[in-house]
UniProtKB/Swiss-Prot annotation:
This is Leucine--tRNA ligase. It is found in: Cytoplasm. A motif ('HIGH' region) lies at residues 69-80. GO terms for biological process: leucyl-tRNA aminoacylation. Its EC number is 6.1.1.4. ATP binds at K763. It comes from Bifidobacterium longum (strain DJO10A).
């Protein structure tokens, strides 16, 4: 029988703090908080006031939030709430600092996870999603999270969908003007598409494709105008290579495909297909998305991940001429090494490149047989090669170690500098959605180009030689390998002046960087290229062939021209249909085609509308938005989800998120604290920043960034157990036995040997512990206390239910210090604490305040335990000492603290009580720095009282290095109070 089970026996005093009493206390205070609106945040204007009927009254705003959850059918396990508890502790702390705290929770309810769960259960997604939300909301409420529940919403709510579609409409109706000044003062800004039309109408901007034919904007048909505008819109339709996943029956964004070329969800193969889809022109914001990272308080690892994903590089755009039967065609390439143009001996295009529509009907004379791939003519060869390429995943195509494949197209490109005639190949390692889908091949300076040249017998020209003092020599490479280096001396790179090519150019003798600058200037003067910036980032594929997502506010006329629906028509709701399952295919069927479930609902698709020129027949777009759409802007809707006139009202936005709205936010503004997993670094976080910047440019919001501070919580891990067959067995039924010869514990299940492994917590691993189990057996406060004490918030930590009882014992001891277990009344003394107590109390206040500011609740808890242990040793517990202790513990274990506060005679909730302030007369005296060593290496330092009890010092030391011990009990702990704790970890 566990200690906790013993504590619930009938012979216990009536007011012993145990699981049953904890539940009574927690239910009582949660009801009070709900009825009084204790955690209501006060808006500046309108009806959203705080629980006492006041408005903000000049209080400083503080906005703390979590990455909102998918409403999974499985509900929560104890690993999920770590971030929620952390943000709740921070929110409660800031309220006690006198700040007006906005802390709310919504639900990310559209998308693939919800749809797949509905398909599995045979119920409509709305039914399952709403049931899941209700269950998850119950679990979170029972945890005692201090949300303003008036601000709760789900992304599937029609009122929310309306504004998601409204934002899409603003993005669709915008273009990126490189010359405009954005609100931050730098160049480049989203502007209304009407301004672009005005530039075309006035002649200020040339009409693409009509620079020389004299046509005016008004001369073009509506369809022609829309085609041109589509090439500028920030949300646009294009036929381009996409990631097609037959196993899921939908296309995926690059960010949703793993490095192995599989779907992030389901792990299905992903193939490259050319399809007509919606995209968002996020690449226009590439530079700003990188540059503005410097102004926000994010973990460096996340900033680095975004910088690498965006992948800004400086190089040149170069135009080659390709001769075809239909005349000369332009082939644009992007290269980071324009200095190597003299070493280009062939060119390669993606199998999807538009130039391959112009291949000749016959092979040119004298083409080597191995260039033809065994095909009778270029048309057959290119078609077959393209089909083969589409059957490969993107990862397979760019695999450096894989066999280099390719074939000649029958076309030749002309080097714009040398005039050399270069054979044009197609190869699947060139991707259409990276760069321009065409590359100049320099086998003397690139390993992949070199391997390709060797395979097809193409010439190799070296244009860079090692530096004279490098100790290296080009002879070491010639005929053997490429010389790959950005630092060297340029050779074999000069051309005489000609009428066709322009001025003479010589790069010989220059260092590489100097050669790049010189050749870029020559390219621009010759009109065949220019220095430019490119990005690894691709435009965001924004449409999905799913049912459970936001419909696009777009309809098409009989001629296929898209039309944006007016705001008055929003929201466009999903039809309530019985057949919502996506059509999936054999995961390896690369030739399959997407089929949007909405296309099967003809009554919804075909509509009669009057869009200003009379009633006509239109057809709705049958794609839906990705699940990222709703999560791109949800943080703003917390400000006022009841507002039917604005996405967010400007005054309220500025109060909660505007630049310098408090001492934390800085010039960029944004949410003060955003807690969530690092796995969203290049998905949700990047997309949200993009949408926010568009809205910022257009004047709808006043902060340049959505989230000022980001904090990535760690992961709660757990042990799982298997039998000798390798099958997982219920972790809660496994019995730990004596250690074996190596000192490791043994385990049995139903009397049979069991094997232990460490990793994630999951239903399939049979090691889930639910919050409901914790509430029933320990209470929410003990659960909160345990999660916050397990180790640093930003590091992963192992769950061990056996260790939870330690937190319960601490709360029991504190309860006994305040409450008589027999009468249930407070029994503290009004006497002034002695000087030793005052010193420990005020040092604890100072130290715990610092820990709370630094989001280190684990070490704060350790210090509170030390203070409580001291109070336990006194003959009578002074009110003046225990009340500050209760206030400091309240953000972590709020229910029991509210109950003790009430029993001490306070009529109001302690949630708005001022945070304790240390009396400086007692701070800093009689303390010493204790060193915590593991295997002789210093791993932590603690400021502790000189007369600290060795047992208390041991507890603080173990808490400080809990993450380094991996959840295991140390083999030995040697305490030399007050200065040294030496730990020998378990092997």
């Amino acid at each position: 029988m566990s200690d906790n089970e013993k504590s619930t026996q009938t012979e216990e005093p009536n007011f012993r703090y145990n699981a049953a009493l904890a539940q009574d206390i927690e239910n009582k205070w949660q009801k009070i908080w709900d009825e009084q609106g204790t955690f209501w945040a006060a808006n500046v204007n309108g009806d959203l006031k705080d629980g006492k009927g006041r408005n903000a009254e000049g209080r400083t705003a503080y906005f703390a939030m979590d990455m909102f959850p998918y409403p999974s059918g499985k509900g929560l396990h104890v690993g999920h709430p770590l971030g929620y508890l952390a943000s709740d502790v921070v929110s409660r702390y800031h309220r006690m600092k006198g700040e007006n705290v906005l802390h709310a929770m919504g639900y990310d309810a559209f998308g693939l996870p919800a749809e797949q769960y509905a398909v599995q259960t045979g119920q409509h997604p709305r039914v399952t999603t709403e049931a899941n939300i209700a269950n998850m909301s119950r679990q979170l409420h029972r945890m005692g999270l201090s949300f303003d529940n008036r601000r709760t919403f789900a992304t599937i709510d029609p009122g929310y969908v309306r504004w998601t579609q409204w934002i899409f409409s603003r993005i669709y109706d915008s273009w990126y003007d490189e010359d405009a000044t954005n609100p931050s003062g730098s160049k480049g800004s989203a502007r209304p598409i009407a301004e672009l039309v005005a530039k075309f109408e006035s002649g200020e901007k040339a009409i693409p494709g009509h620079e020389s034919d004299g046509k005016q904007w008004s001369d073009l048909t509506d369809a022609e105008q829309q085609d041109i505008l589509n090439d500028f819109r920030l949300a646009y339709i294009s036929k381009s290579p996409v990631n097609w996943c037959p196993g899921l029956g939908t296309v995926l964004a690059n960010e949703e495909v793993t490095a192995e070329g599989k779907s992030e969800r389901g792990n299905f193969p992903v193939f490259q297909r050319e399809l007509r889809q919606w995209s968002m022109r996020i690449t226009k914001y590439g530079h700003r998305l990188i540059a503005d990272l410097d102004g926000i308080n994010w973990p460096e690892k996340v900033k680095l991940m975004q910088r690498n994903w965006i992948g800004e590089s400086h190089g040149a755009s170069v135009h080659f001429t390709v001769a075809t039967a239909d005349g000369d065609k332009d082939m644009e390439i992007y290269t980071t090494r324009p200095d190597t143009l003299f070493g280009t001996t062939f060119a390669v295009v993606s199998p999807e490149h538009h130039l391959l529509e112009n291949v000749p009907a016959e092979w040119p004379a004298d083409v080597p047989e191995d260039w033809k791939g065994g095909y009778a003519n270029p048309v057959e060869a290119v078609k077959a090669y393209r089909l083969a390429a589409e059957a490969k995943t993107a990862k397979d195509r760019v695999n450096e170690a894989g066999e280099k494949t390719g074939l000649f197209t029958g076309l030749y490109a002309t080097n714009p500098i040398t005039g050399a005639k270069l054979p044009l190949f197609t190869a699947d390692y060139v991707l259409m959605d990276y760069g321009t889908g065409a590359i100049m091949a320099v086998p003397g300076g690139d390993q992949r180009d070199y391997d390709f040249a060797v395979k097809f017998g193409l010439p190799v020209i070296y244009t860079v030689t090692p530096l004279p003092d490098s100790g290296d020599d080009l002879a070491n490479y010639e005929g053997k390998a490429p010389f790959v280096s950005h630092d060297g001396i340029v050779i074999n790179s000069s051309v005489e002046a000609t009428e066709a090519k322009g001025d003479a150019l010589s790069l010989n003798g220059l260092r590489v960087d100097d050669a790049i600058a010189k050749v870029n200037a020559w390219l621009e003067s010759a009109g065949v290229g220019k220095g430019t910036v490119s990005y690894r980032l691709r435009d965001w594929l924004f449409s999905r062939q799913r049912y459970w997502g936001e419909p696009f506010p777009i309809v098409y006329g009989e001629d296929g021209t898209p039309h944006l629906l007016p705001d008055s028509a929003l929201p466009i709701n999903l039809p309530d249909v019985p057949d919502y399952e996506p059509r999936t295919f054999d995961p390896m069927d690369a030739e399959s085609n997407p089929e949007a479930p909405l296309s099967r609902n003809e009554d919804w698709v075909k509509v009669e509308l009057d869009l200003g020129d009379g009633k006509k027949t239109y057809y709705r777009d049958t794609n839906t938005m990705p699940n990222w759409a709703g999560s791109c802007w949800y943080y703003m809707r917390y400000i006022d989800p009841t507002d039917t006139k604005h996405m967010v009202e400007k005054d309220e936005f500025d109060y909660w998120m505007g630049p310098n709205h408090n001492k934390y936010s800085g010039d960029e503004g944004g949410v003060d604290l955003y807690i969530g997993g690092v796995e969203h670094a290049v998905l949700h976080l990047l997309y949200s920043r993009f949408w926010h910047k568009v809205l910022f440019d257009l004047g709808y919001v006043d902060s340049a960034e959505p989230f000022h501070k980001l904090f990535n919580q760690g992961m709660i891990q757990a042990y799982a157990y298997t039998d000798d067959r390798g099958q997982y067995v219920p972790a809660d039924e496994v019995v730990e036995g004596p250690a074996d010869a190596s000192g490791e514990p043994t385990f049995t299940w139903n009397g049979e040997h069991a094997n232990r492994e460490f990793g994630k917590m999951g239903k399939s691993l049979k090691n889930i512990v639910t919050p409901d189990y914790m509430y029933e057996n320990y209470g929410a406060d003990t659960f909160r206390l345990y999660e916050m004490s397990m180790g640093p918030l930003d590091e992963s930590r192992p769950w061990n239910t056996r260790n939870v009882v330690g937190g319960m014992r601490f709360l029991q001891r504190l309860w006994r210090n305040v409450v008589d277990e027999t009468t249930g009344q407070a029994h503290v003394t009004e006497d002034t604490p002695d000087e030793k107590t005052l010193k420990l109390l005020n040092n604890t206040i100072a130290e715990v305040t610092a820990e709370m500011e630094g989001m280190r609740p684990n070490t704060a808890i350790a210090k509170l335990i030390v203070l409580n242990n001291h109070l336990t040793g006194l003959k009578a517990v002074p009110r003046a000492a225990v009340e500050p202790l209760i206030l400091m513990l309240a953000p972590i274990a709020p229910h029991i603290c509210e109950e003790m506060w009430s029993k001490l005679g306070h009529a109001e909730s302690l949630s708005a009580e001022p945070w304790p302030v240390a009396d400086e007369r007692y701070v800093g005296h009689d303390t010493v720095t204790a060193v915590v060593q593991i295997k002789g290496k210093v791993r932590a330092k603690l400021e502790v009282p000189v007369d600290i009890d060795p047992a208390d010092l041991e507890k603080q030391a173990l808490a400080a290095v809990a993450d380094r011990l991996g959840g295991k009990e140390p083999r030995k702990v040697i305490v030399k109070a007050p200065k040294i704790v030496s730990i020998v970890p378990a092997e």
